């Protein structure tokens, strides 16, 4: 069976967010399920969910996490530094797995490596799948630059550092699959990086 990446667009107040489904016809991992649990579950069909991974704790990315995971009793993974953000969406609940830099998830015949990349939030992570030539960047990096939060950057310098230190060294043809908007490549991000630095925090305005 061929391992593939499927995309599901989940509605959100600031515009649709990208839920990513990685796996084959038997089993999958769901990345950032958004807020439309019914829509994600419909897209999954009868494929088994091995894990639900949240790249960060903002509600528009994690609201459906528990409901999607519950169907197959799958664990939910989140970096512990985003626990307080997670609890805004899920009071009294905790994620099952506390992700760390370098952690690995396996699904079908591929591996997803956790890249700790704080800046957008204290616990933001990316997930690199060398086997499929893709990196899932959440809101660390969109096609047009670092993702703001409500038009502002809590830690613009930290976010740029995460991009420059952890993402740009990946192979140039790596697909960048963000938490919102269209995909891009590492090559395009590297080409645009200096302009993002020059624009500063006003980039998101």
Protein language model features and the residues they cover:
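Active-site HxH/HxHxD metal-binding segment of metal-dependent hydrolases
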Residues: 14, 28, 35-111, 141, ...
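Residue-level detector of beta-strand structural context in well-folded domains
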Residues: 18-20, 97, 102-103, 125, ...
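Short beta-strand or tight-loop elements
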Residues: 3, 108-113, 123
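Metallo-beta-lactamase
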Residues: 28, 116, 122-205
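Hydrophobic/aromatic beta-strand patches that form the interior of the parallel beta-sheet core
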Residues: 6, 53, 77, 97-99, ...
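Conserved beta-strand hairpin/beta-sheet module of binuclear metal-dependent hydrolase folds
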Residues: 1-47, 126-138
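Short Gly/Pro-enriched turn/cap motifs at secondary-structure boundaries
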Residues: 10-12, 96, 116-118
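A generic secondary-structure signal marking the coil-to-beta-strand transition
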Residues: 4, 18, 27, 95, ...
């Amino acid at each position: 069976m061929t391992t593939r990446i499927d995309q599901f667009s989940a509605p959100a107040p600031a515009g649709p967010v990208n839920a990513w489904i990685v796996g084959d016809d038997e089993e999958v991992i769901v990345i950032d399920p958004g807020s439309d649990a019914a829509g994600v579950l419909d897209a999954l069909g009868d494929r088994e969910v091995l894990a639900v991974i949240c790249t960060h704790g903002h509600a528009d990315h994690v609201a459906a996490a528990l409901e999607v995971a519950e169907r197959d009793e799958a664990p939910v993974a989140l970096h512990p530094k985003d626990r307080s953000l997670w609890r805004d969406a899920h009071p009294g609940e905790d994620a099952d797995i506390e992700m760390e830099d370098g952690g690995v998830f396996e699904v079908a015949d591929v591996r997803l490596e956790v890249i700790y990349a704080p800046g957008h939030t204290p616990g933001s992570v990316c997930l690199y799948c060398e086997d499929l030539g893709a990196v899932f960047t959440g809101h660390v990096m969109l096609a047009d630059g670092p993702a703001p939060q409500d038009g502002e950057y809590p830690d613009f310098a930290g976010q740029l550092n995460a991009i420059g230190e952890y993402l740009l060294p990946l192979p140039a043809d790596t697909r960048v699959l963000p938490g919102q908007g269209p995909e891009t490549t590492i090559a395009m991000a590297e080409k645009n990086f200096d302009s993002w630095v020059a624009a500063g925090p006003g980039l998101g305005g």
